Amino acid sequence: MGGRNFRYIALDFETTGLDLQTDEPIQIWIMEFDLNGKVLWGFQSLLRPVKKATELKSIVCFITKLSIQQLESAPRPEEIIEEIQWFFWEDTIIVGHNISFDLHFLEKFFPWLKRKTTLD
């Protein structure tokens, strides 16, 4: 990669379901790490869905172990932009399991994000 210093972050979302058209992120995890796998920095936040949290499928609460009350008091995605934007610099490589799923939600709910290099 040409001697450039790249940043590596792991990204993971919990969502209300698997459909990008109708579902929303309800939790985000971001971890920056070095080439040796040492975690340098991390961020985690619950996210309040646009839909009323009371409309969530009970299976979502069961799988994620998140309560409706936790989600109703969480920030909306646009309220955490300042806290997460520094993770996504031009030299950032995003890694994760099934990362395309997370990237689709990231790009929909954080549209300012430009496509970065990814590793799945």
Residue ranges of model-derived segments:
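Short, flexible loop segments at boundaries between secondary-structure elements
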Residues: 119-120
